[in-house]
A protein has these predicted regions:
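N-terminal glycine-rich phosphate/adenylate-binding segment common to multiple enzyme folds
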Residues: 47-159, 163, 270-274
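N-terminal alpha-helical transmembrane segments of multi-pass membrane transport
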Residues: 2-8, 18, 22-23, 28-53, ...
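Glycine-rich phosphate/diphosphate-binding loop of Rossmann-like nucleotide-binding domains
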Residues: 6-25, 29, 154-247
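Internal helix-turn-beta structural module
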Residues: 318-324, 342-403
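Flexible, glycine/charged-enriched surface loops at secondary-structure junctions
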Residues: 35-41, 201-209, 233-246, 341-353, ...
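A structured beta-alpha segment of the ubiquitous adenosine-cofactor-binding alpha/beta core
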Residues: 49-62, 233-262
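Glycine-rich phosphate/nucleotide-binding loop
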Residues: 256-355, 362-366
């Protein structure tokens, strides 16, 4: 069979630990035999990030902006223990955070659903995608402990010399104070990414804040979303028959639980942090969650939503058998190749992405799975295999599908 040709390179970001092992297995077994892979490779493994003073992370993000589509392996964000383990000379920042900042992107996470794994919420029939605004709010806040009676004030000093001041609270004893912010530019970028992704995936978009209580802060989010929708996307949404819907965050939670799924739920930073974990667990497994970073100007970076699977990696180093779930990493590859094919007008590459995912579903529907999924599967006689066995089973079914 002739390999599928590519015209534009895919930006490939390698990673760490067990996911790095899976990365090579997936490439060798499921990509390279079928695709004449054209990629620009960046090693984001922690040792090389340390060696390059993290310049490789910056370079990879700039390449993603240049070429438009990237696929990323899970990476370690170092802490004190990792600094010692890897003999690092600095505690480097999260690669995802660096890439997200450079691409000015929004993270969209969605579950991979199969008939034999039922969501905890019985009426969910389709995946629910979480769009999390990954800038500001409590994550960029400053905090102060007040240890005596006094007055806390919010002060803004404009460059023009104009000064605004408002009392937060008059303390008659000890307490805590927090100040947080966001920017119109960041909120607007978030809105554009959400509307574009909704059009791209032909799904309704929900957005929720608490603007009845937060009449300036949250209200600005709502206002900007409405402005962006009315000026840039309303007509296209109508053409596609999809809807933009705003509601309060508490009402949104109730509606999500009652829904059948099949939409994008845009959330502020904290709400998205919490709700993405709730959704991944309710749908079955974090190992079955896809993640794509989308910039406002339509650049894409695909990855798995999970980490580097450290525990399995240590067992792998000891020569022990591991049954690590590669599904989310495979779907990162399939999503990136499909998008590359779509942008370059290569139908065969788009179809390959579809067929690769279908081969994964065929394998699971035949009861062949990694250990983490076996206990979750119902209505099928499931057999646990190791990572290599699972990938081999997918390849066998992929070859059948490709003829």
């Amino acid at each position: 069979m002739e390999k599928i040709k590519m015209t534009t390179p895919l930006v490939e970001m390698d990673g760490d630990e067990m996911t790095r092992i899976l990365w090579k297995m997936i490439k060798d077994e499921l990509i390279l035999p079928f695709v004449d892979l054209k990629s620009e490779y960046y090693d984001l493994g922690l040792p090389y990030r340390d060696q390059t003073n993290d310049q490789v992370t910056i370079d990879s993000a700039e390449a993603a902006k240049k070429y438009g589509v990237a696929v990323k392996c899970a990476t370690i964000t170092p802490n004190a223990q990792r600094m010692d383990e890897y003999k690092l000379h600095k505690m480097w920042k999260s690669p995802n955070g660096t890439i997200r900042s450079i691409m000015d992107g929004t993270v969209f996470r969605a579950p991979i659903t199969i008939p034999s794994i039922h969501p905890c919420v019985k009426n969910w029939e389709k995946p629910i995608t979480i769009a999390r605004h990954a800038y500001g709010d409590v994550y960029k806040s400053v905090e102060l402990r007040a240890d005596e009676p006094g007055t806390a004030k919010l002060v803004f000093e404009g460059k023009s010399g104009k000064k605004q001041e408002i009392e937060i609270h008059s303390f008659d004893g000890a307490g805590v104070i927090q100040g947080m912010h966001n920017t119109d530019k960041s909120i607007r970028s978030f809105a554009h990414s959400c509307f574009k992704f909704a059009i791209d995936t032909k799904q309704d978009l929900w957005f929720a804040t608490k603007d009845t209580i937060s009449k300036t802060y949250d209200a600005q989010f709502r206002k900007i979303f409405e402005e962006v929708y009315e000026s840039d996307y309303k007509k296209k949404f109508a053409e596609l028959g999809i809807e933009y819907f705003y509601t309060l965050i508490d009402d949104a939670v109730a509606r999500v639980i009652r829904s059948k799924g099949g939409f994008i739920w845009a959330c502020k930073n904290y709400d998205g942090d919490v709700m993405s974990d709730m959704l991944s667990t309710a749908f079955g497994s974090l190992a079955m969650m896809t993640s794509v970073l989308v910039s406002p100007d339509g650049k894409y970076e695909y990855e798995a939503a999970h980490g580097t699977v450290t525990r399995h990696y240590y067992r792998y180093l000891k020569g022990e058998d591991t049954s690590t779930n590669p599904m989310a990493t495979i779907f990162a590859w399939s999503g990136a190749l499909r998008k590359r094919g779509e942008l370059d007008g290569i139908k065969e590459l788009q179809e390959f992405g579809d067929q690769l995912e279908a081969a994964c579903f065929d394998t699971l529907n035949d009861g062949i799975a990694t250990k983490d999924l076996v206990n979750l599967m119902e209505g099928v006689e499931a057999k646990a295999v190791n990572s290599a066995g699972f990938i081999a089973a997918i390849r066998e079914r992929l070859e059948k599908r490709l003829g």
